[in-house]
From Swiss-Prot:
Chemical reaction(s) catalysed: malonyl-[ACP] + acetyl-CoA + H(+) = 3-oxobutanoyl-[ACP] + CO2 + CoA
One GO location term (cellular component): cytoplasm
Location in the cell: Cytoplasm
Primary gene name: fabH
Comment text on domains: The last Arg residue of the ACP-binding site is essential for the weak association between ACP/AcpP and FabH.
An example Gene Ontology molecular-function term: 3-oxoacyl-[acyl-carrier-protein] synthase activity
Name of the protein described by the UniProt record: Beta-ketoacyl-[acyl-carrier-protein] synthase III
Keyword terms, alphabetized: Acyltransferase, Cytoplasm, Fatty acid biosynthesis, Fatty acid metabolism, Lipid biosynthesis, Lipid metabolism, Multifunctional enzyme, Transferase
Assembly mode: Homodimer.
Entry keyword Cytoplasm: yes
Domain of life: Bacteria
Amino acid sequence: MTCKIIGCGQYLPSKIVSNDELTKFVDTNDEWIRTRTGITQRHIADDTEYTSHLALKSAEKAIEDAGISANDIDLIIICTTTPDHSFPSVATKLQGYLGLTNIPSFDLQAVCAGFVYGLQVANSLIASSKYKTVLLIGAEKMTSLLDWNDRSTCVLFGDGAGSVILQRSSDDSGLIESNIFSSGIDYDILYTNGGISMNGTSGKIIMQGQKLFRHAIEKMQQSIEELLCANQFSVSDIDYFIPHQANVRIINKLAELLNIEEHKIIKTVEKHANCSAASIPLALSTLKGLGKIKKGDILLFSAIGAGLTWGSALIRW
């Protein structure tokens, strides 16, 4: 038994900040950002808009897209690294917003790989036959973790949320297989310099960009090749490749190494920037909204995040 995606939704804050606007308070320029990242703008939540609010707005759209009622949901998983509070979880707050009671809800923290991790966890719980309809969300307010004086990180991230509704599949559609990995010895490649038990703050993002670039390509390629081989798929079988939207150079290099045709690669990083766990469901929702996905299409997700955490998933639509 496997799960399938029956609905998608997304939400991006209304405030858009272009590269040119960033030059007003950080030493950078549009060409420098575009050539290194592919990013031209990012959405930024205001001070009164929290991760739970982003999650709610995307969830409502996914529920509508799936043609279900919120009352049909029997499990909520939110993948986030920017919760409203240390506790309770964003998922329980969202559950309250939706007026749901007596169902489990929890946050999952695997940073940019969170959605792939969440998909595997949700699928396992659906396969247990205990849960029928799962709301899985990637939601992030990454700009709350930025040092706006650090041009190596502040230009990279944005805010947003993407949601999917998952149900048990009764045919060959749905999650074919996924894999997830982590390597704790590499945690200092990307981390925040704060933490509740360490110094009582959330901290700001610290990143070793060149090391992360190398690890991202190596580990995502390995994950994808293992997944394809295990399921007797070739790259030519993939209809759409939806990678984590961290950096267009990573996406392009990975596609080159795997020989994935350009028209199959979904890129939203230009307009969304890096929305961490929200990036894949945002890209998926964007693609679905264009009406391009057909029944039977094979979708490949792949992501890497801090930890390091990484993984991939194959979906038959």
